[in-house]
Amino acid sequence: TARPDRADRALDRDRAVSPYALPDGNVQIAFSGGRTSAYMLHQILETNGPLPERVCVSFQNTGREMPQTLDFIQECSQRWDVPVVWLEYQPEAPRFQIVNHNSAARDGEPFEALVRKKRYLPNRVARFCTAELKAHCASRYARSLGWEAWFNCIGIRADEQRRISAQPLKERYQHWRPLVAAGVSKRDVSAFWRRQPFDLRLQNINGRTPLGNCDGCFLKSEANRAALARDHPERYAWWVRMEAMNDSTFRPAEPYKQL
């Protein structure tokens, strides 16, 4: 019939003008498990329809994400019918492993394995945790697919330009930031989730999620880390244990045990 043809033509037009239209070539979509990256994934799916084989959606689990984050990723995958590859760092070759919602680490095991291998703690200057647990883990998986080059799709909004870094010179991927091109702000993301039948079950404070990503990250404010210690002492204890194990601190002269 003619109706599918009209729908296909409309989709082609949307792809031609939309900032969410997939670029040519291989694409790795980074899904952090937060509201912004989930919104980005939704918009990409709305524009392009089912993703072709040259596109993969991946989540790199550090083991320090809140359980609600893991559940949210799984729910997005199921509701939107999009496969998500769950990855974790491992110290042995190929230095990543594929897991799933059921088998994913929930007590910082990948993070601890990295700290034990490095024999020192990451900090605000040497953020090897982000590099190894997230970026390099994703790149190693992409290389395992036989990809020589690809686009790395990341969920940075137009209102957080300070987070935009220069293109890494030695990497095989190019950054793709559709939310920046679309002019998306945190207000847009919050408005989207108010309209949805489900949401990330973590507190949203003016577009920010204090317990998002790594629960006790040393880049978070003292107030956020103190709230974790107060409300989730069993989770906060992991950060204290890492400092004791290394006889060092994540932040200079600010040991976690003193909060």
Identify what each model region corresponds to.
Residues 1-259:
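Nucleotide-activated chemistry modules centered on ATP-dependent adenylation/adenylyltransferase
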